[in-house]
Amino acid sequence: SDSVQKSKENSKNIEAQSKNNQDEEDLYSYNLIRSVFKPKSKEPQPDASSDDNDRSVDIGHQERLQNKIREELADYFVNPSKEEAERHMVWVEVPVWRLQDGKKVSDTERIQVLNVLASDVKEIFREIYNGHEKFPIKRLIGYTWRGQNSMSFHNTGRAIDINPEENPQMDIDGRVLVGKKWDPHGNPYSIKPNGDVVKAFRKRGWVWGEKFRKKDYMHFGFKEM
């Protein structure tokens, strides 16, 4: 019957949505969203190419930020909505390098993030700007409302996407879903493993989407402790 068919289609849609959300759930506890705040026992492990910056993470700094985030977003976690989320967002201006006619020139970029993370974000991009790579920024995406049922940390300004076209999101089989091609050795806009961008985020407790089962090279999110 039509009702049975619709039920099957709904089940498939729910299953597909669950799979799409699984990567962030693997790294960030589902309970954080539900205001229970019980971290999962398994933490993502550094890969073999990680260097001493992994061990330079200020755990106390992360814990203090997490406590501030939980307090700041307490109402949102109970009743998530776009209006509630946007009450906690701020715009920050950060220094960046642009590529113009093959040369790197200094500029600034504005990005909307969770107010509690604003200082961290400024420090991160100041460090990237001062790094030896002079990593060029074409586009930044911070806070983006993706629906009340979305698990994305972009909903609460705790995620940043960098140069999406050159740092694509992949499916589990390595096919590109968003963006074009990740080429860290040939494309200056592609994020390098253990480069200035990864180091600046990682040592402040942000997780790179390269760690996901479905790679998301553009993505950095402030992780749950």
Regions found by a protein language model. Give the residues of each.
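Long, low-complexity repeat tracts used as extracellular stalks/passenger repeats
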Residues: 4-33
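N-terminal module-boundary/linker segments of secreted carbohydrate-active enzymes
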Residues: 23-98
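Active-site acidic/histidine clusters and adjacent loop/turn architecture
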Residues: 70-140
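Active-site-adjacent loop/helix surface patches within enzyme catalytic domains
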Residues: 123-161, 165-169
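Stable alpha-helical elements in mature extracytoplasmic
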Residues: 29, 65, 117-124, 158, ...
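Catalytic cores and adjacent binding grooves of peptidoglycan-active enzymes
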Residues: 151, 156-225
